[in-house]
Amino acid sequence: MKIKGKKLLLCMAAVMMMGGAKAQGTDAPVATMDLTLKEAISVALAENPTIKVAEKEIELKKIADSEAWQNLLPDASINMNLQHTILAAEMKLNDMTFKMGKDGVNTAVGAATLNMPLFAPAVYQTMKLTKQDVKLAQEKARSSKLDLVNQVTKAYYQTLLAQDSYNVMEQSYNISKQNFDVVNAKYGQGRVSEYDKISAEVQMRSLNSSLVSAKVGLSNAKLQLKVLMGVTANVDIKINDKLENYESSLVLANVESSESELQNNSALRQLDLNESLLNRSLKIQHTNFMPTIAFQLTGQYQSLYNDHWNVFDYSWSPSASFAIAVSIPLFKASNFTKIKSTKMQISQLQDTRLNTKRQLGMAVQSYKDNMASSIAQVNSNREAVKQADKAVTIASKRYEVGRGTILELNQSEVALTQAHLTYNQSIYNYLTSKADLDYTLGRENF
């Protein structure tokens, strides 16, 4: 997604938040953001500092790429020198003394120099190296985005799980409270024993404690999601979604895995690019055995033996020259050890890539197995919820007519609560395994 599109989405979200802003006791504005998974990912990609750092790193590599080819451009400089001779040197030859200049005079020289490389193999290879470095920075930025999308996706599903768990516990608590009210009323009429009243009250208070814990878990899940999105603490997020809505999208994972599946994995791509960089570095080191050719053009004005300091009144004489310099390396021991070291690094990188690919292949297979297992669990747990709900209805009727006990009623309610939680957990397990699989395979779901 383009950055402009992200910013537009963020502005729309800000308008929505301001529309729902309230003022509490401290007059701190509290905004509410209606959130979907797609919106959460878009906001995170636009605002997360890690992504911004990765994008700036790409710009730095592009600047380095520009610096590389600029080494082929001419280099021009101007130098000026004003020298005052206090005492000129003397030369003696066969008892004769010759003065090498004059005492107390000024010599002025102004020179312009132009240097330009004609053949610089190291520069050519460095230019190719920096282009590979830009690609590596882009792949690292892509890896950061994939990692962030994976974290946001799982945090979103974690929030859904916490939200659904809270709703289940709230529903169970309300049912237990209704049962306690009924049992307490019957106890007041002398129709049930005190044991039934105590059991119903214990059940209600136990579920109330679980409800409080579920509420804390929901708050923590939302906080984690907001941190990943880069959303401030005074913004509340509202998710009109639940895990049950994703049941229809559960697809049995393909058990077979192919070699091409991992071609988009960012870790393998980075290893390949690093190997390319090492190969390019090896070629740069080989250029240490090649000659270099440079062109130099020099022009200068000089004025000699001036007895005053007014340079504008000097008598200047021009001169110019050019030179072609050829440098041929003959021997440098460190060049050979550098090449040997780089070849060893390439070999290490190849072994690392092979091991990484094997581990990723096992991870992919594990995620697929978990997805297949979760689908089977979802199908089983769905039926368990239906049966547990039916059992609660039967236990309630039996207790109302005096054929059942409070223990049966409590057990049926606990079984229903557990069935709902297990059902939601199995869907969550599938979705998180699917998110990890997408991340491992380098799927860009953004």
Task: Report residues per predicted region.
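Bacterial Sec-pathway N-terminal export signals of envelope proteins
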Residues: 23-77, 81, 233, 239-279, ...
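Small/polar, glycine/serine/threonine/aspartate-rich low-complexity segments that form flexible
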Residues: 25-33, 79-116, 242-250, 283, ...
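Extended amphipathic coiled-coil alpha-helical segments
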Residues: 53-71, 116-117, 124-157, 161-185, ...
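Residue-level detector of the transmembrane beta-barrel scaffold of outer-membrane proteins
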Residues: 75-79, 113, 126, 270, ...
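Bacterial N-terminal signal peptides
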Residues: 11-19
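A short glycine-centered flexible hinge/capping loop motif at secondary-structure junctions
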Residues: 187-191, 399-403, 440
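Acidic, low-complexity, intrinsically disordered peripheral segments
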Residues: 2-11, 24-30, 41, 422-446
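Periplasmic alpha-helical coiled-coil/stalk elements that build and connect Gram-negative outer-membrane
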Residues: 2, 7, 22, 35, ...
